[in-house]
């Protein structure tokens, strides 16, 4: 028995009302962590099967020319989702305490990358900050690279 599983699931669908598997506000990151937390909170169990392997080849579905664009997307959504998850499951004070400390670190990393003229890194960090701030302000997970 485990607390969290990512990537591959076999579930008893009858345990879920109205197919409420996923929180539709979350996009890309923390979906499985959120689902696992809700499963455990409802007194259900999560098990892993040791002799079954799955493989996830990250970013294999796109052309390499989109790598940087996808890194920006990843930077934005990971930080948005992390704050949202913490706020949803541990409360607003816990979420803001964690996020404010991380935001300060991000600002210092951003300034450092600007000083050393690492513009690609600066932009990635800026997207991390942007995603985190949007979540902290209660904005939805709206960033999509093909729309922005």
Where in this protein do the model-derived segments appear?
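Non-catalytic, C-terminal membrane-associated alpha-helical segments of glycosyltransferases
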Residues: 73-81, 92-148
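Active-site donor/metal-binding and catalytic loop motifs
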Residues: 42-69, 82
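Short alpha-helical functional segments enriched in proximate histidine and acidic residues
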Residues: 85
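Flexible, glycine- and charge-enriched loops at secondary-structure boundaries
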Residues: 25-29, 68-75, 122
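A short, conserved alpha-helix in the catalytic core of glycosyltransferases
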Residues: 3-53
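Alpha-helical structural context
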Residues: 88-89
């Amino acid at each position: 028995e485990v607390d969290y599983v990512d990537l591959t699931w076999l579930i008893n669908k009858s345990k879920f009302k109205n197919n409420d598997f996923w929180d539709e506000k979350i996009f890309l990151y923390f979906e499985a962590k959120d689902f696992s937390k809700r499963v455990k909170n409802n007194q259900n169990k999560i098990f892993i099967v040791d002799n079954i392997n799955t493989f996830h080849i990250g970013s294999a579905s796109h052309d390499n020319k989109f790598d940087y664009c996808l890194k920006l997307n990843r930077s934005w959504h990971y930080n948005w989702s992390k704050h949202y998850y913490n706020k949803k499951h541990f409360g607003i004070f816990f979420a803001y305490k964690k996020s404010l400390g991380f935001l300060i670190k991000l600002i210092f990393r951003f300034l450092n990358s600007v000083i050393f003229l690492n513009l690609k890194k600066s932009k990635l960090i800026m997207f991390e900050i942007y995603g985190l701030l949007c979540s902290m302000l209660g904005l939805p997970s709206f960033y999509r690279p093909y729309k922005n």
